[in-house]
Amino acid sequence: MAGHSKWANIKHRKAKQDASRGKVFTKYIREIVTAAKLGGADPASNPRLRAVVEKALSVNMTRDTINRAIQRGVGGEDNDDLKEVTYEGYGVGGVAVLVETMTDNLNRTVPDVRHCFSKTNGNLGTAGSVAYLFTKRGEITFDDVSLEDKIMDVALEAGAEDIEVSEDEILVITSPETFGEVQDALAAAGLKSDNAEVVMSPSTKAEITDIDQAKQVMKLIDMLEDLDDVQNVYTNVEFSDEVLAQLDA
């Protein structure tokens, strides 16, 4: 759990940086369009849509913008050619990387993703080369650890698979199928999460103890997330305490 918490801190910091770049709106709109297209326009019955709508609202996207994106999805406008494609590869130090994209032009996306790996001494692999190292699961996080007992009671009753508690975070883990039900149960109990999403979680970790390698891994993640077609980047990296302190400096 400590590794999750440390990496989460970096993710949260990066999320703020990404928002300042102004690209997060485009990525959320694409996700809303696709989620609505695949699962319908009602967030109450579409957990994927509900999760991204909550994220969009958290970065001050207007309801009008969100609703227009939902209508684009269910109406099939402008997104018929948008495809979800996942790329796999390795960064330095044997770090496994999954890159989820939404693209209307594979001839643009593939070279862009490959360039990010090659510029940071990594390698873009073939389908299946690292996917087996990750498991799809729901993650619902709370920063208020004083709510541990109540969260545990509600989440487990609603079908959560596991709950991990650190000194600064509670992580509720669900299957992708029960994610929405557990999220609803927690919300109904007055427990507002700080983040909720279905992710690809690594089953093993690649620890990086060298600061130069750590910087290359972070550069790879930054470069990938800067690509317009990239929606999510998942890795199995775990930085040592010493490296993390230097990255945070």
Curated annotation (Swiss-Prot):
GO CC annotation, single:
cytosol
Q: Which cysteines are joined by disulfide bonds?
A: none
Keywords from the named record: Cytoplasm, DNA-binding, Transcription, Transcription regulation
Give the chief site where it resides: cytoplasm
**Any keyword DNA-binding?**
yes
Q: For this chain's UniProt record, which GO biological process terms are given?
A: regulation of DNA-templated transcription
Query: What SUPFAM superfamilies does the entry give?
Result: YebC-like (SSF75625)
Which Gene3D superfamilies does UniProt cross-reference here? 1.10.10.200, 3.30.70.980
Keyword DNA-binding listed: yes
Mind listing the GO molecular function terms for this protein? Answer: DNA binding
Subcellular compartments: Cytoplasm
Q: Which Pfam families match?
A: TACO1_YebC_N (PF20772), Transcrip_reg (PF01709)
Q: Describe the family membership recorded for this protein in Swiss-Prot or TrEMBL.
A: Belongs to the TACO1 family.
Which NCBIfam families does the annotation name?
Answer: PRK00110.1 (NF001030), PRK12378.1 (NF009044), YebC/PmpR family DNA-binding transcriptional regulator (TIGR01033)
Q: Specify the protein name.
A: Probable transcriptional regulatory protein ABAYE2155
What organism is listed for this UniProt entry?
A: Acinetobacter baumannii (strain AYE)
